[in-house]
Amino acid sequence: MHFMKKYLLPILVLFLAYYYYSTKEEFRPEMLQGKKVIVTGASKGIGREMAYHLSEMGAHVVLTARSEEGLQKVASRCLELGAASAHYIAGTMEDMTFAEQFVLKAGKLMGGLDMLILNHITYTSMNFFRDEIHALRKAMEVNFISYVVMSVAALPMLKQSNGSIVVVSSIAGKMAHPLVASYSASKFALDGFFSSLRREHGVTNVNVSITLCVLGLINTETAMKATSGVFNAPASPKEECALEIIKGGALRQEEVYYDSWSWTPILLGNPGRKIMEFLSMKSFTFDKLISS
């Protein structure tokens, strides 16, 4: 108790004051002008809206999704909105070779890469988990493993540009929900992996930011179909959600919260976890690993 009063509580107060009241840089659309950006899951929903916002800001975009017809329409609209360039490559993120090669091809098309926005998912219906190991494996591969594969492929280019990785996740990856066990597992995996990778970047002085976007229910066709009749909550607009994701990536924020409930970022932002992460870093010795 004495330790808490003397040390832990003052640290907590200082941390909270800094976290909630520190001056943050304001977003400006010019931040994306001429930037080279990959957007996955871009044929519809949040991905499509991000592609449109980026185009209005004058970015170069390379888009991917499974639907070539959908991508063609989105890319054409991107050029109309003012994209510096707009390309697309259709394919499935179940194929890890495609995931890797897409990033490399996109980099060649744009002559580099400034921002990798990972937004794709495999469709998962809401139901009780019983023995659907195949569905669990597919969710982990598409929603998580492919994100890692693409990040690994993109890192050499992002290191050159001091760029950003933007990972679109979910509240289901921060707190337990029923009926979405496989989906939730893949989203928790994103938080664990990319939050750890962010800490490693800090230790090794890699100037590539990682932004985890924690979303509530968004009014995309896929989400509305999946939740119909089993989950009743107000859905937030995909257009505004897409813009908040881009802002968070451009400002190099660690996390972005977007949900209809205003208390979500306060309750899930979890300053206690951040304090524990900060304190735990003092237990590691990295010299041997860095020099090897």
UniProtKB/Swiss-Prot annotation:
- Which residues of the sequence carry a binding annotation for substrate? 170
What membrane topology was assigned to this protein in its record? Single-pass type II membrane protein
Its domain of life reads Eukaryota
This protein's major location comes to endoplasmic reticulum
Cite a single GO BP annotation. Answer: steroid catabolic process
Q: By its UniProt entry, which Pfam families does this protein fall under?
A: adh_short (PF00106)
Give an example GO cellular component term for this record: endoplasmic reticulum membrane
This entry's Enzyme Commission designation comes to: 1.1.1.146, 1.1.1.201
Give the molecular function GO annotations.
Answer: 11-beta-hydroxysteroid dehydrogenase (NADP+) activity; 7-beta-hydroxysteroid dehydrogenase (NADP+) activity; oxysterol 7-alpha-hydroxylase activity; steroid binding
* Transmembrane intervals: 8-24
Q: Which residues form the active site?
A: 183
List positions binding NADP(+).
Answer: 41-67, 92-93, 119-121, 183-187, 218-222
Q: Which residues form a coiled coil?
A: none
Q: In which pathway does it act?
A: Steroid metabolism
Which reaction is catalysed here? an 11beta-hydroxysteroid + NADP(+) = an 11-oxosteroid + NADPH + H(+); corticosterone + NADP(+) = 11-dehydrocorticosterone + NADPH + H(+); a 7beta-hydroxysteroid + NADP(+) = a 7-oxosteroid + NADPH + H(+); 7-oxocholesterol + NADPH + H(+) = 7beta-hydroxycholesterol + NADP(+)
Give the glycosylated residues. Answer: 162, 207
Listed InterPro entries? 11-beta-HSD (IPR051253), NAD(P)-bd_dom_sf (IPR036291), Sc_DH/Rdtase_CS (IPR020904), SDR_fam (IPR002347)
Keywords for the protein's UniProt record, in alphabetical order: Endoplasmic reticulum, Glycoprotein, Lipid metabolism, Membrane, NADP, Oxidoreductase, Signal-anchor, Steroid metabolism, Transmembrane, Transmembrane helix
Q: Which residues lie on this side of the membrane: Lumenal?
A: 25-292
* Paired cysteines (S-S): none
Q: Which tissues is this chain's protein expressed in?
A: Detected in adrenal gland, liver, kidney, testis, and at lower levels in brain and lung (at protein level).
Any idea where this protein resides? Endoplasmic reticulum membrane
* Quaternary structure annotation from Swiss-Prot or TrEMBL: Homodimer.
Family in the record: Belongs to the short-chain dehydrogenases/reductases (SDR) family.
Function comment: Controls the reversible conversion of biologically active glucocorticoids such as 11-dehydrocorticosterone to corticosterone in the presence of NADP(H). Participates in the corticosteroid receptor-mediated anti-inflammatory response, as well as metabolic and homeostatic processes. Bidirectional in vitro, predominantly functions as a reductase in vivo, thereby increasing the concentration of active glucocorticoids. It has broad substrate specificity, besides glucocorticoids, it accepts other steroid and sterol substrates.
Protein name (Swiss-Prot/TrEMBL): 11-beta-hydroxysteroid dehydrogenase 1
Q: Which organism is it from?
A: Mesocricetus auratus (Golden hamster)
